Amino acid sequence: MSVINTNVSALYSQNAMKTNARAMSTAMEQLSTGTRVNSAKDDAAGLAIGQNMTSQIRGLQQAVRNVNDGINMLQTAEGAMVEQSNMLQRMRELAVQAMNGTYSDVQRGYMNSEFQALGLQINRIATDTKWNDQSLLNGELDSTTLDPTGAGSATFTFQAGKDAGQVVSIDIKATTLTSLDLPLSAFNDDGDMQIGTLATATITLTAIETALETINEQRANIGAAVNRLAYTADNLTNIASNATQSRSTIMDTDYALATTQLAKTQIIQQAATAMLAQANQQPQGVMALLKG
């Protein structure tokens, strides 16, 4: 049947061109952005899953940074304890030296001056050592909780995971003179912590050895906590890497597939354009009939 008001062939060609143009636009967008799912229309379920995984990945990455902050904090505390331990070792040497009967009390007095100065410096390190403007060794961090929810009530809270309930507890004891059973008030000429005489040097040596044991125990606890946090960071990094790979499979453009799709749609578009031109020529046959 020859008609001129309705060109069905042209309508089919136009519809095919519109559908193909959308597919070609999608392929070009995927190639341009490197992302397979650029909007919900591309893959609604994939977009939802991808966004959820993005949230998890970013949370895990931040958790790794927070755990590393915790490690840095603990290493700062241990570094201060190393210096305190060195000073206590020197104080022990002085006490042992003062116990030697070959020295006079005057000479022991010289040793005592260094001894007491070291004791005061140990206390200063404990009160002045800070990380992120927070004191570490003056007793403020006893029973600190590293809370992954970020809602802990302790001085320091670190998110060590992407979900609530992942809690790492550590204990940083004070290393002031008082906490080491070396009262600050005892470090003077009339106090107990001196080595000016043979008798006081003997008593003081025992106290210094006890303080050294306390410092060493604290360093061991911190070392264990650092190792625990380091393994936590490694595990979080591994989880984040696997999640990133999974998200890539869902969200990223497969360039081999997308370039094939683009080439296909370009060929179809050219063919559809040619067919539309042919369809538009069909009504011309009616003119031939009228002229005949």
Mark where each language-model region is.
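Primary detection of the long, small/polar-rich alpha-helical "axial" segments characteristic
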Residues: 1-292
